[in-house]
């Protein structure tokens, strides 16, 4: 993808995949640069906003993460968007907002089981962000 970027630096698909690869490698700050570039190249680019939201969350930039998740929710939200926005609200200490967003994620998933499957995949990042392990079942009981 880097070679494609060298040849066509404005190729949005390459920019997206480079950002995604960097995020998968845990290079969130560098990935953010690519997602911001994609947001600049394509206006109202929800997939750029998703990348910015997640990388910002992992990088402890919670206000920035919430800003982008709120933009997504105003446009074309998926269940994962509500869930990730819920994660951000939770680590920011807004339990009521988090529970509401998780509730919307459950509705968007179609079943509680599908939501729980997605949610449990994010337990490690939640713990790294300061959510206590014993609080996870308590949050799930609220839903």
Regions found by a protein language model. Give the residues of each.
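Terminal, low-structured helical/coil segments at or just beyond the last alpha-helical repeat
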Residues: 109-143
């Amino acid at each position: 993808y880097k070679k494609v970027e060298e040849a066509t630096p404005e190729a949005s698909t390459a920019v997206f995949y480079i950002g995604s690869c960097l995020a998968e490698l845990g290079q969130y700050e560098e990935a953010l640069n690519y997602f911001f570039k994609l947001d600049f190249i394509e206006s109202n680019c929800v997939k750029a906003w998703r990348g910015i939201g997640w990388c910002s969350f992992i990088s402890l930039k919670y206000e920035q993460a919430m800003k982008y998740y709120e933009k997504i929710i105003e446009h074309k939200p998926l269940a994962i968007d509500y869930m990730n926005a819920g994660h951000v609200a939770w680590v920011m200490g807004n339990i009521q907002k988090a529970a509401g967003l998780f509730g919307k994620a459950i509705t968007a998933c179609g079943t509680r089981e599908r939501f729980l499957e997605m949610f449990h995949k994010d337990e490690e990042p939640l713990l790294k962000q300061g959510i206590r392990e014993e609080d996870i079942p308590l949050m799930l009981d609220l839903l």
